[in-house]
């Protein structure tokens, strides 16, 4: 039996607790409770198993990972194991003593999320008064510390016109990299698609803004587009079970953070099975790995080893079957569902459903 290549990255979702209430959150609709979270010893074992498996990077995420009092200890474990560590944070819980402790522990990089460039826009999306000022203060602390920093802006219908101002803020705060990431419509994003999905004109405007910023030079810019205006799908996390492994707060192991929407599937847990066994031989990770599972037209497509059939969770959400061709693809028999979603979601005003951790 030929084993798959090891994953490059581990997404360690330490907790679903978060002081923000973003309506596009990538967490599942059913949030895991604090009582179910893995303890420090178990997360340490997960990191050790990840390093042994061949993982190179660990991304500490959430929720808000800074809600975990053992974050510094886990960062130090990652350093001991020579795992590149990235903290994905809202910044609202970050202060100078905490940052100094993370720096001493060996943290390699911080991705700081912003909901908008205006206070009103940030509070409308994040739901936390004063969050924008805290984020700006956090960015200045990170810059002063010398830890490399990426600013992440999630964009959608309400803030997409402010992308140039996002770049201006990034330059002001001394970020080396900026990620302009359109909302991805899974989980909370899918629940709020009617309110958040931009028009094609807005998408094209955002692309022009990104291209103009890249032309200036001096700032590295990552750009993630929404699938709904495309005619070919993106590879799901670089291909299902090929590059990434995700561990939830309670220890469930997923090929991507949205996979739990797929029904009638057993999700293995690091408390019961080693990460190596899960990655190499579990039915879950082999379910859509490679190309043998593909239906037509994917099976005969020249792009099948580039996009790997697209997103299984999107196929599940829009067609009811995770094995179907990603409906974003213009060759998919279900492509009309994406076209209809775009048409239906162009309402001038829609209600936002906020992610609440109660």
Swiss-Prot record:
Its EC number is 1.21.98.4. One of its GO terms (molecular function) is oxidoreductase activity. This is PqqA peptide cyclase. SMART domains: Elp3. It catalyses: [PQQ precursor protein] + S-adenosyl-L-methionine = E-Y cross-linked-[PQQ precursor protein] + 5'-deoxyadenosine + L-methionine + H(+). Belongs to the radical SAM superfamily. PqqE family. It comes from the Bacteria. Interacts with PqqD. The interaction is necessary for activity of PqqE. It comes from Gluconobacter oxydans (strain 621H) (Gluconobacter suboxydans). Pathway: Cofactor biosynthesis; pyrroloquinoline quinone biosynthesis. Keywords: 4Fe-4S, Iron, Iron-sulfur, Metal-binding, Oxidoreductase, PQQ biosynthesis, S-adenosyl-L-methionine. [4Fe-4S] cluster binds at residues 18, 22, 25. One of its GO terms (biological process) is pyrroloquinoline quinone biosynthetic process. Residues 4-219 form the Radical SAM core domain. It is an enzyme of class 1 (oxidoreductase).
